[in-house]
């Protein structure tokens, strides 16, 4: 009986040491521990909307592979609008609506669409020109923007393609508001 108790103490100590080394990423089992649930994590992947109405979920398909991660919180609807885009999301691990791991998203940025690099931000008109203002305050003057893009001034949009040429694609993330 004493050997079994000592073995359990050693096993508990090893588990505790392993948990202390956690960098905030999702453990292989998919359920975050108490320490990682409070940690902010940044993930990259492709957004997808899965399921059938009225029970759809917005998920991140991680760039490195692995299980889908449900994206929840105030950014959910904006993320649904960029389904198919590659994004970088930041947030905290939490419980989702399904058995899959979930991330309560605090912020995100569109990084690529259809294999083309992309940037997102608020669209402004400045002296007759369209300017994209990124989350970090960078101001990017858009070269030969399509006329339809002007209708989105005041909203958050993504623009794909080289920034020194006409945008190859664009889309709405959040309407002006």
Which residues does each predicted region cover?
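Beta-strand/loop nucleic-acid-binding surfaces
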Residues: 66-80, 137-149
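Bacterial N-terminal signal peptides
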Residues: 8-18
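Structural detector for short beta-strands of small beta-barrel domains
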Residues: 37-54, 113-127, 161
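Short, acidic/hydrophobic/Gly-rich beta-strand patch recurrent on exposed beta strands
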Residues: 58-64, 131-135, 172-174
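Positively charged n-region of N-terminal signal peptides that target proteins for export
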Residues: 1-4
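OB-fold/S1-family single-stranded nucleic acid-binding modules
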Residues: 94-114, 164-177
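Bacterial signal peptide processing site
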Residues: 22-24
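Short nucleic-acid-contacting surface segments enriched for D/E, G, S/T with interspersed K/R
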Residues: 76-89, 146-160
